[in-house]
């Protein structure tokens, strides 16, 4: 445990959990809450299971956010995303749940999640979802119109 930040995962032995668990997510105080950086996080090895066939689905997850008072700790995010490994859920549901879990944890000014999933049967699924506080609704609408 990192005492000054009260983080459990960073610097500790890593037990990998492969069942969905939002409690793995951790945050730390934003050192510059007066700035509005757009932070991009990319997970190139996201895996979940198809809820119908139980076959693995592979994708790249992009998370972009403008923090308010808290920022996500990256190792906890990695462990959280790995926890989807044996979780049966459709791509769209995974993306929505990731957004909701991060919004609950961070209470950001703006947050978006985009999934670029490997094709199945010749069709690629690329869900996008975003969230914004009142003051960032215009930014949210523009991002939605220009979603990747």
Curated annotation (Swiss-Prot):
The active site is at residues 50, 57. The keyword Oxidoreductase applies. Pathway: tRNA modification; tRNA-queuosine biosynthesis. Substrate binds at residues 72-74, 91-92. Catalyzes the NADPH-dependent reduction of 7-cyano-7-deazaguanine (preQ0) to 7-aminomethyl-7-deazaguanine (preQ1). It is an enzyme of class 1 (oxidoreductase). It catalyses: 7-aminomethyl-7-carbaguanine + 2 NADP(+) = 7-cyano-7-deazaguanine + 2 NADPH + 3 H(+). GO terms for molecular function: preQ1 synthase activity. GO terms for cellular component: cytoplasm. It is found in: Cytoplasm. Pfam families: QueF. One of its GO terms (biological process) is queuosine biosynthetic process. Belongs to the GTP cyclohydrolase I family. QueF type 1 subfamily. SUPFAM superfamilies: Tetrahydrobiopterin biosynthesis enzymes-like. Keywords: Cytoplasm, NADP, Oxidoreductase, Queuosine biosynthesis. This is NADPH-dependent 7-cyano-7-deazaguanine reductase.
């Amino acid at each position: 445990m990192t005492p000054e930040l009260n983080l459990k995962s960073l610097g500790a032995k890593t037990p990998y959990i492969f069942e969905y668990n939002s409690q793995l997510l951790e945050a730390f105080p934003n050192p510059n809450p007066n700035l509005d950086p757009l932070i991009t996080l990319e997970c190139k090895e996201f895996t979940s299971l198809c809820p119908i066939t139980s076959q693995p689905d592979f994708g790249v997850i992009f998370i972009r956010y403008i923090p308010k008072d808290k920022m996500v700790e990256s190792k906890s995010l990695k462990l959280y995303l790995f926890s989807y490994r044996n979780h049966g859920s459709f791509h769209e549901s995974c993306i929505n749940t990731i957004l909701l879990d991060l919004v609950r944890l961070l209470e950001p000014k703006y947050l978006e999640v985009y999934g670029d999933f490997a094709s199945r049967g010749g069709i690629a699924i690329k869900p996008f979802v975003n969230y914004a506080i009142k003051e960032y609704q215009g930014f949210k609408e523009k991002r939605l119109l220009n979603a990747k």
